[in-house]
């Protein structure tokens, strides 16, 4: 159906001429940012120069961490229902002496190396991801402004920007007043040009690839696995199963150190023929072709992801570009935005100091550089054959999955003073099984609490009855209006003035269960005590009011802390994006030291 008929993904009426955040680009990165800002109750306008969302092709692979993120956002179900899943990878190779043959097969995300809750790649074209995020935004009253090409940005006063864009449907220039501008507008980002000294650094290689999405007719036996093919005469191919019985082929047209194939020559027919030569003696024909693309591999990172005033930012491909061979682009891009959204929310609301925004560049530029370093080695391994590629996968599989994307010590990731716990600051919280005390439901600790831009303060209490005095003292101190209680009061006032952006679906999530104590902190307790060992009424008021986040442990304590003694309490501070901010253990007589440690972590918050 034509966009003009069903209006899907369109702005209704004129965009507002003043907002808080303008996002340029409605691909996965821009939509992830705008969607989260809308959820947090922040006014946002999202501009896109296309008339509609992506219909076919482009990014297609969701890694385990991205699947987890969509589950945390309660948006994963349509993708889990309709996308293809890949659990394994096989390696094929030919030599001058032997025809094409399978040389190895392995689990894509081994439990002992990755430990992901969803140990597979989820395959669906980019438009399916965009549609889910668009639908969620629209349910909260935010619509993409289409046919809107970003033109320029200027500063009109302290903290005031004027964003100009071209309305392509009327050929007129329109302006929006905003406090922040975020460019999610791709590798040729125009927003990036308004950030001083932010040009891309790195290499444009000679490696070029053709990409085909379609339904294939073949006698190749591993059609429904991820397959890396290396031939001695016709380069490499990467096979990826897709939704609706399709397969994506990445077909190598020229190597990194070879002569680049002219883009005009790299037609659909040329790429098909190249693939047929590589797959000989197997039959390879296309029943349909839904999408075709080709690209030259560039491996570059922007020198800066934000301007000195922390008013203009870039995310996604605007900040980094690389090959598509490891399905990292959309995954990394969406997590750029996921990182930025909660920080913007806290600063805009006056709940955190503006310096918090500097951690966006520190953290996400590190991940971008880690990605490029991996991608360089990954592309080399593809050219070297099965043994090198298998080694590269094993060495980097945690990073590829997203689980191993780790941040350095800094404002938000406080060193644990040599504490040797399985979970460390700067790492994603580890999956763990627990049972909710209040209703006896078994849940995943990393998924159960909805994303409401709250820090989660987990108290791991091996034995509740012997720890009641510790819990009472700590809870009273945390609720004190001279400490975290004061920050909670400020957050409550902010969210009364500008509430969360709720949708009808939130009625079933019941976010009010998690904001009873605070809009900015969620307090949770995980215990190895039996349900019959204590009543909620035995707990201090702070934890009584947190009844939906009281958990009976299955394996979370061991996964996060290892062994905790009965006379110890473990505390883990988890950031709104699921990363561990700090972790520590104390004796039952150290409630005051525990409180000071928690308050010291939150020094970046406004009093």
Specify the residue positions occupied by each region the protein language model found.
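C-terminal helical "tail/cap" subdomain of flavin- and related membrane-associated enzymes
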Residues: 2-4, 12-14, 104, 345-480, ...
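Core beta-strand elements of the Rossmann-like FAD/NAD(P) dinucleotide-binding domain
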Residues: 17-19, 170-180
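Glycine-rich FAD pyrophosphate-binding loop
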Residues: 36-59
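Active-site-adjacent segment of FAD-dependent monooxygenases/related oxidoreductases
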Residues: 55-138, 157, 231, 240-241, ...
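Conserved FAD-binding catalytic core of PHBH/FMO-like flavoproteins
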Residues: 135, 142, 159-161, 180, ...
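A conserved short coil-to-beta-strand element within the FAD-binding core of flavoproteins
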Residues: 146-161
